[in-house]
A protein has these predicted regions:
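Long, low-complexity, mixed-charge
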Residues: 1-110, 116-119
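Conserved beta-strand/loop scaffold segments within soluble protein domains that form the structured core
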Residues: 4-5, 97, 105-364, 380, ...
Length: 405
């Protein structure tokens, strides 16, 4: 097979034209201040065990089917432990698969969307390629870890996940700053769920108060496929903006949830866009936002019913834990046929003093009562998750609830 080595050039041309194009939402960032950096020496991951475990990464990998590690722009390892599962760096995948990868590159995310997609194509490095072959059910989760430690650095990997027909996999992506530093993370993730396939995608972020976070994610779900996504962020950060776009074909289903806890002067603009493209597709967008200090978050949720017999629901809840923080929720429902069912509910408020006093009257200290209420607020029922993933999410949520009070 003849490999066209120049097929990426058209994307680079588009990217060069939008290097000054701001995002539609969120705080604008001067991308010229950040450059990719190589690490001076490879650190021992065991030294960062607590940090890695807090974002869902298992250092020993006993209950993992494969793993990918990247620090700054440097790929540390990409390993598959199970037949039917391929894990490579994106550069290795391009070299190995050549023209085949063109069908999955900048398809669900457009390279000229904004300056962050552009910089990922022009200056980005690394990223994982995960492919689950037709008919394979991957027993344990796959984990991907993206870490940053260098000051004024840019980390902009391009990740591609392909779950072929009748396959199933769970992916845990943990992203974190290894120390206090100024940086920009602008990862691109494209996910393709084949016919009758299922992908569970869990992303956990823990950054710091000087980081700008700009993930760009696009998902395409084939006929009768299932995509489940849960995003967790518990951190201070300078700013965050992300709006994953999920497209469902006939009979496909999606469950998109997020739990975001902000503190300090953090600014976030977060949400999902769900497009019910073909008949009998359905999905939910569930968000839980908690703010402390002077933090602010805008939570967006858009569902477009673009075919008959589709169903969608939005549930946005916000909890203000300080008088100076702010939560703004913006649900949008767009029905283009008369036989669709699109609904939403939204609420923003503070902890109920009545409920706190009720728990105190039953023997709980005030901090314990508040912790129980916060834990209950953060709980989301995610359908069909493997038991191991459920336990990990529950454990992470409990740790977050304890750290808030």
């Amino acid at each position: 097979m003849v490999i066209d080595v120049n097929w990426r050039e058209k994307y680079r041309e588009k990217a060069r034209k939008v290097l000054d194009k701001p995002s539609k939402y969120g705080v604008d960032v001067d991308i010229k201040e950040y450059m990719p950096q190589e690490i001076r020496e490879e650190p021992s991951l065991a030294e960062y065990r607590d940090l890695l475990e807090s974002v869902g990464i298992e250092v020993e990998e006993k209950n993992r089917s494969g793993s990918y590690y990247q620090i700054e722009s440097q790929v540390i390892s990409a390993i598959s432990k199970q037949p039917g599962l391929e894990i490579l760096s994106i550069e290795e995948a391009i070299d190995r698969h050549g023209n085949e990868l063109k069908d999955y590159y900048w398809r669900t995310v457009h390279v000229d969307q904004d300056k962050y997609t552009a910089i990922a194509e022009l200056r980005g490095s690394g990223g994982y390629y995960i492919r689950v072959k037709k008919g394979y059910k991957i027993s344990f989760p796959i984990q991907a870890c993206l870490l940053m430690e260098m000051n004024r650095s840019l980390q902009a990997p391009h990740n591609i996940i392909i779950a072929e027909e009748n396959s199933e996999a769970s992916i845990i992506t943990g992203c974190a700053a290894m120390k206090e530093m100024v940086g920009l993370h602008a990862g691109i993730t494209e996910i393709y769920v084949g016919e009758n396939a299922r992908v569970n995608y869990i992303m956990i972020h823990k950054w710091n108060r000087a980081m700008h976070i700009r993930p760009r994610t696009g998902v395409l779900v084939g006929r009768n496929g299932v995509y489940v996504s849960h995003y967790i962020a518990f951190t201070e950060m300078k700013s965050y903006q992300s709006m994953p776009r999920v497209i469902l074909n006939e009979g496909a289903r999606a469950y998109l949830s997020s739990t975001i806890v902000l503190d300090g002067d953090s600014r976030a603009d977060s949400g999902y866009e769900l497009i019910l493209k073909e008949k009998r597709s359905s999905g939910q967008i569930i968000s839980r936002s908690l703010t402390k200090g002077n933090s602010e978050i805008v939570t967006r949720a858009i569902i477009s019913g673009e075919a008959p017999e589709v169903k969608g629901h939005i549930d946005c809840q916000g909890l203000l834990l300080s008088d100076k923080s702010r939560i703004l929720t913006i649900p949008i429902l767009d029905a283009k046929y008369d036989d669709v069912m699109l609904t939403h509910e939204a609420a923003v408020g503070k902890l109920s003093e009545e409920k706190i006093l009720w728990l105190i009257a039953r023997g709980f200290r005030r901090d314990e009562a508040e912790g129980l209420l916060i834990k209950g607020f953060m709980k989301t029922e995610i359908p069909g998750l493997p038991e191991g993933l459920e336990k990990m999410i529950r454990y992470t949520s409990e740790k977050i609830a304890k750290s808030i009070i």
